[in-house]
């Protein structure tokens, strides 16, 4: 492909390299190199940082699995886990008669210990994800990370 820009509107046009579409190239369009095109369409630092934060939150949402049961790690579920743990501890109970997990399945006589372990594991994972996000954000700000496909999460 060969690319052109309209200097008045900044619209970018692409045409076949073989010349088969040359008759459609409007007068006044300016050819641009592949390198210039890549720079023009590359996300800004702010966009990359926003995308990075969204990706970290998506990782958090996945949560953890304890004894075959998934516990989501989003803020609402973290709060629900905390409240459930506090209630059970205040009531002196060690099992939930019924527990509805993050996959919308019900579990009978679900151990409080598993919920507590999940809550703790979610917190540990969240700390690791935020640390990784910080490292990647520094690389983005420095200009050494320009493609989030290179990001791997712990």
Predicted segment positions?
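A preference for well-ordered globular domain cores
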Residues: 1-154
């Amino acid at each position: 492909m060969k690319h052109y820009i309209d200097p008045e509107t900044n619209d970018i046009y692409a045409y076949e390299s073989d010349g088969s579409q040359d008759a459609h190239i409007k007068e006044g369009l300016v050819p641009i190199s592949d390198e210039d095109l890549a720079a023009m369409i590359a996300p800004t630092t702010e966009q990359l940082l926003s995308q990075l934060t969204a990706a970290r939150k998506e990782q958090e949402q996945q949560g953890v699995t304890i004894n075959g049961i998934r516990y989501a790690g989003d803020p609402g579920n973290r709060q629900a886990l905390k409240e459930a743990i506090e209630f059970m501890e205040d009531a002196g109970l060690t099992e939930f008669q019924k527990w509805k997990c993050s996959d919308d399945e019900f579990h009978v006589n679900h151990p409080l210990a598993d919920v507590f372990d999940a809550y703790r594991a979610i917190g540990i994972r969240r700390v690791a994800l935020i640390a990784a996000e910080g490292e990647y954000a520094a690389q983005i700000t420095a200009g050494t990370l320009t493609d989030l496909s290179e990001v791997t999460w712990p």
